[in-house]
From Swiss-Prot:
EC number(s) reported in the record: 3.4.21.88
DNA-binding region as annotated in the record: 28-48
Family: Belongs to the peptidase S24 family.
Lineage, broadest ranks: Bacteria, Bacillati, Bacillota, Bacilli, Lactobacillales
Residues carrying the site annotation Cleavage: A95, G96
Name of the gene: lexA
Residues at the active site: S132 (for autocatalytic cleavage activity), K170 (for autocatalytic cleavage activity)
Species this chain originates from: Leuconostoc citreum (strain KM20)
Full protein name: LexA repressor
GO molecular function, one term: serine-type endopeptidase activity
GO biological process, one term: DNA repair
Subunit structure: Homodimer.
Amino acid sequence: MAIQESKQIQVLRFIHEAQLNNGYPPTVREVGEAVGLSSSSTIHGHIERLVKKGYLLKDASKPRARAIEVTDSGLEALGVSTTPGRIPVLGQVTAGAPILAVEEEATEFFPIPDNLMQFDGDMFMLNVRGNSMINIGILDGDKVIVRKQDNADNGDVVVAMNDDDEATVKRFFREADHFRLQPENDAMAPIILKQVAILGKVIGLYRDAIY
């Protein structure tokens, strides 16, 4: 059953967003400021009704600032999916010489880590082949998590594609009349290109085994 009272929706949504952004619930004062309520008793009343409806859970064993969390029913009332998202694995990318790499169809799926949930729907993964990024801990056989974007700042680690549809993972630099894709391996030379397409920025790493 959806929440009917608009202020309750606002209170619930603010608590949920504060937990996502900060890792803990807001104070009563912060809730009031966010939803336009000055009476702490009114805010407590909304919270108690949300608890009774099963949308909030109060844990008496925790300090007051950590005592409230949004339940699955509360998330559903807000229209937030409670089904864990998955990142598609779209083939492989080299940490070496560029190769044909990115596929349109996913070969497998990987659960989204909690700290990357905000990027759900905007990520893909690639299997790494090669050793050109070993100085920053990207090893042959790793999977990189990539946030889809078509631009990058100097120094970002990106998945980039050249005019021959060859993709590679490198550190990106925009210079006077060219782009430099810099490996993180002292034994390898940079790739210099006149044109480059950014497929995304590397924001995470997964490794199947401990080396």
